């Protein structure tokens, strides 16, 4: 059964805390969302710390393929938070970043509203003309066109459409 996660960060930290405690590792304090904290001085946070492990994620283009083909809403939410974290502004900065990109493409408010990354919020909206404008920009730019097409599930072959349209003219 699938459920939506209202706050992926808080869900993760609570799950991590629970898993650590179940493994017999004591964890002090409550699990909280980082957006609930006041912004600390990064330099003072790093004093006395050393890196234990480091992981480089896949390229964004590969993450987008997985996100779109399999409809990974948590990935979409995480990307919106990541966009916002560049400015240290969380989801609010992410919404503004997406809105700014769309404005650069000629798609401005009130024709679009970004409430979350997955598109599941009832407060997201996009007019038909705004969607056409976005698709037109993507179509005219060879880089964006190639990347976008790569992310779409193929009927009867992969992603959320892998079991649909098999044996029909729509397959492939």
Q: Which ranges hold each PLM region?
A:
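Short, mixed-charge aromatic SLiMs
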Residues: 40-44, 104, 154-164
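Short, Gly/Ser/Thr-enriched beta-strand-loop segments that form substrate-interacting elements
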Residues: 50-54, 163-172
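Active/binding-pocket-proximal capping segment
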Residues: 144-159, 167-168
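A small/polar active-site loop signature that marks catalytic segments
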Residues: 1-147
């Amino acid at each position: 059964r699938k459920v939506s996660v209202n706050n992926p960060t808080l869900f993760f930290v609570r799950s991590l805390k629970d898993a650590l405690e179940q493994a017999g590792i004591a964890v002090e304090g409550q699990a909280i969302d980082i957006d609930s904290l006041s912004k600390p001085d990064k330099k003072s946070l790093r004093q006395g710390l050393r890196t234990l492990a480091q992981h480089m994620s896949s390229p964004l283009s590969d993450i987008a393929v997985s996100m779109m083909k399999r409809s990974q809403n948590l990935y979409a939410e995480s990307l919106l938070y990541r966009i916002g974290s560049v400015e240290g502004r969380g989801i609010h900065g992410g919404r503004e970043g997406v809105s700014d990109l769309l404005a650069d493409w000629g798609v401005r408010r009130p024709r679009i509203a970004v409430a979350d990354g997955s598109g599941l919020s009832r407060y997201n909206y996009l007019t038909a003309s705004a969607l056409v404008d976005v698709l037109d920009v993507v179509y005219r730019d060879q880089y964006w066109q190639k990347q976008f097409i790569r992310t779409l599930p193929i009927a009867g072959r992969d992603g959320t459409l892998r079991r649909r349209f098999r044996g029909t003219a729509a397959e492939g």
